[in-house]
């Protein structure tokens, strides 16, 4: 594999030296598919159904399949491709629609991946920035000093042609873009709009890598203006701002975007607009938060600027209510499964001056994170752990498993929820969710043995409960006193994805 990476990097260096960006020829290189497979592609897409190739044995090598694919690509004229082409209908169509998009997505990621690696070499704590909880530690440090917050939804739907035009600004390989256009034209209504939910059905499970590449490209372009604004403000060049850069997928075009957007933006807005010293931005998937210390009027200018920027540059119209501006002291916002906000904590300070003492009442701003109970119960209802009233019910589909397997499954869910929501400042909502899962586990066991919950709890005893306590709970108890453990927020830097039961949309 090192040889493949060396050969690939040598090819790209030659093309970079020639000041060309031709990625299309990589589709005809066998090592590209091996490299993409090694980096996490689903291996099943490299195997065409054996009845289509004339084989009776399902264990044939994938290298032969790739060679046949490359031969077909050489023979196929993509300028005249049609949805009615007999070579790509029936079983062959499935193979074409799976292998080509995944290979294309892997090739399109190559230039950005190499720039990403070179950028990460300068960061010694990159792993910490990958954690979702690092966002909250950043907000905890910054939001208590800010006044206003904007909840922003990245605009969609996206027209396919607009999306391709956006890609042309960063990918100058016309044959590759034409291949992508042919694929999208064949597998989707060209005049339709892609919404976040619709795109899941358009791009099948096998094509998720291509969809993620297109979606990340779209999101990056939508927030590219913020890269320019960050360059304009010297106050944003703090260590914490590295987290923003780490969560931007495509690094190599930052300088290019700054030059382009500077020329476009300075003609439409006065320069004083960018002099705001404290503007902070975080994003996860399609939801982003922008907070500032500026006035409500200036926040509205930010809102109108973003809406006009998306409309003029990308022909995207923000959804009604896509940007909400609220005062931090009076508003809490939903982000990554937490209900976050800034609340005033009253403090009484005793001041001693010689023989006189004074009691001073004051308030300190504190970043507050709460686990929203109703969205979590809604997730448990969808997963059939409880009803809409929060009353635990049995998980009937697990009733055929062994007792230890059932307990382990419920314990794993409870452990992950506790791990993710460890940053909550109030743990009573989390305790209620744990109780629902425990009783649901007991009811599932009672359903299996045709018994009662009381009899199951009496028979299993402590074994039924110990699975719902994590090892980290015991470790953290040595760090904090047990009286403070229920109120302390703990952020873990090993969480890189959200649990499926955590509502975050």
From Swiss-Prot:
InterPro entries: Domain_X (IPR024937), Maturase_MatK (IPR002866), Maturase_MatK_N (IPR024942). The keyword Chloroplast applies. GO terms for biological process: mRNA processing; RNA splicing; tRNA processing. Coiled coil: none annotated. Pfam families: Intron_maturas2, MatK_N. GO terms for molecular function: RNA binding. It is found in: Plastid, Chloroplast. GO terms for cellular component: chloroplast. Keywords: Chloroplast, mRNA processing, Plastid, RNA-binding, tRNA processing. HAMAP family: MatK. Usually encoded in the trnK tRNA gene intron. Probably assists in splicing its own and other chloroplast group II introns. Belongs to the intron maturase 2 family. MatK subfamily. This is Maturase K.
């Amino acid at each position: 594999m090192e040889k493949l990476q060396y050969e690939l990097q040598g090819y790209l260096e030659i093309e970079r030296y020639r000041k060309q960006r031709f990625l299309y020829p990589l589709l005809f290189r066998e090592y590209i598919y091996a490299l993409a497979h090694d980096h996490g592609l689903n291996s099943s897409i490299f195997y065409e159904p054996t009845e289509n190739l004339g084989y009776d044995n399902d264990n044939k090598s994938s290298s032969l399949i790739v060679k046949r694919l490359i031969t077909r690509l050489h023979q196929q004229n993509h300028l005249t491709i049609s949805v009615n082409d007999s070579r790509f209908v029936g079983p062959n169509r499935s193979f074409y629609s799976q292998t080509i998009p995944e290979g294309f997505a892997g090739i399109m990621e190559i230039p950005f991946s190499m720039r990403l690696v070179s950028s990460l070499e300068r960061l010694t704590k990159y792993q910490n920035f990958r954690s979702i909880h690092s966002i909250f530690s950043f907000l905890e440090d910054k939001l208590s000093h800010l006044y206003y917050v904007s909840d922003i939804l990245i605009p969609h739907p996206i027209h396919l042609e607009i999306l391709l035009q956006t890609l042309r600004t960063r990918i100058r390989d016309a044959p590759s873009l034409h291949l992508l256009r042919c694929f999208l034209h064949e597998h989707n209504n060209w005049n339709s709009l892609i919404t976040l939910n619709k795109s899941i059905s358009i791009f099948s499970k096998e094509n998720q890598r291509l969809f993620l590449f297109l979606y990340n490209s779209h999101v990056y372009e939508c927030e590219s203006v913020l890269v320019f604004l960050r360059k304009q403000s010297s106050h944003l060049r703090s260590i914490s701002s590295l987290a923003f850069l780490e969560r931007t997928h495509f690094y190599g075009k930052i300088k290019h975007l700054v030059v382009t957007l500077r020329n476009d933006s300075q003609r439409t807005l006065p320069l004083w607009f960018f002099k705001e010293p404290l503007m902070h931005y975080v994003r996860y998937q399609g939801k982003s938060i922008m907070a500032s210390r500026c006035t409500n009027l200036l926040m509205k200018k930010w809102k109108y600027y973003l809406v006009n920027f998306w409309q003029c540059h990308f022909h995207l119209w923000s959804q009604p209510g896509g940007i909400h501006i609220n005062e931090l002291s009076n508003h809490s916002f939903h982000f990554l499964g937490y209900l976050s906000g800034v609340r005033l904590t009253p403090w009484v300070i005793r001041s001693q001056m010689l023989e006189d003492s004074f009691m001073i009442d004051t308030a300190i701003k504190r970043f507050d994170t709460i686990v929203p109970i109703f969205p979590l119960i809604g997730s448990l209802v969808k997963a059939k752990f409880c009803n809409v009233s929060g009353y635990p019910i049995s998980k009937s589909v697990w009733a055929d498993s062994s007792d230890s397997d059932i307990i382990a499954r419920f314990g794993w869910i409870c452990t992950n929820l506790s791990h993710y929501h460890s940053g909550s400042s109030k743990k009573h909502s989390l305790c209620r969710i744990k109780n629902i899962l425990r009783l649901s586990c007991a009811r599932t066991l009672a359903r299996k043995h045709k018994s009662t919950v009381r009899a199951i709890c009496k028979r299993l005893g402590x074994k039924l409960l110990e699975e719902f306590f994590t090892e980290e709970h015991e470790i953290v108890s040595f760090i904090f006193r047990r009286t403070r453990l229920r109120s302390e927020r703990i952020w873990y830097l090993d969480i890189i994805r959200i649990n499926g039961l955590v509502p975050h949309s």
